Amino acid sequence: MAENTQVDVSRLTFERAIEELETIVKRLEDGKVPLEESVTIYERGEALKRRCEELLRQAEARVDKITTDASGQATGTAPLDVQ
């Protein structure tokens, strides 16, 4: 786990961030982590949660940009400006 905390959260994929977040939740629920370490990994968990939410918002925006015809069939996509 210690090596994971060195990785910048903003560089993680959704899958990697959610995997690490699940690991943190399990460790905290186990109750065997010392208090100071619990606080540290909780903070990391909060950052991971925000990253996952951000990536989900971006994915939702991309899906929302899919254009459809009158019958509801996808006809293409509109450009999306994600920064």
UniProtKB/Swiss-Prot annotation:
What protein name does the entry list? Exodeoxyribonuclease 7 small subunit
Is Ribonucleoprotein a UniProt keyword of this protein?
no
Which reactions is this enzyme annotated as catalysing?
Answer: Exonucleolytic cleavage in either 5'- to 3'- or 3'- to 5'-direction to yield nucleoside 5'-phosphates
Q: What is its main location?
A: cytoplasm
UniProt keyword annotations, A-Z: Cytoplasm, Exonuclease, Hydrolase, Nuclease
Organism per entry:
Bradyrhizobium diazoefficiens (strain JCM 10833 / BCRC 13528 / IAM 13628 / NBRC 14792 / USDA 110)
Q: What does this protein do?
A: Bidirectionally degrades single-stranded DNA into large acid-insoluble oligonucleotides, which are then degraded further into small acid-soluble oligonucleotides.
Mind listing the GO molecular function terms for this protein?
A: exodeoxyribonuclease VII activity
Family per record: Belongs to the XseB family.
**InterPro entries per the record?**
Exonuc_VII_S, Exonuc_VII_ssu_sf
Task: Cite a GO CC annotation.
Answer: cytosol
Enzyme class (EC, first level): hydrolase
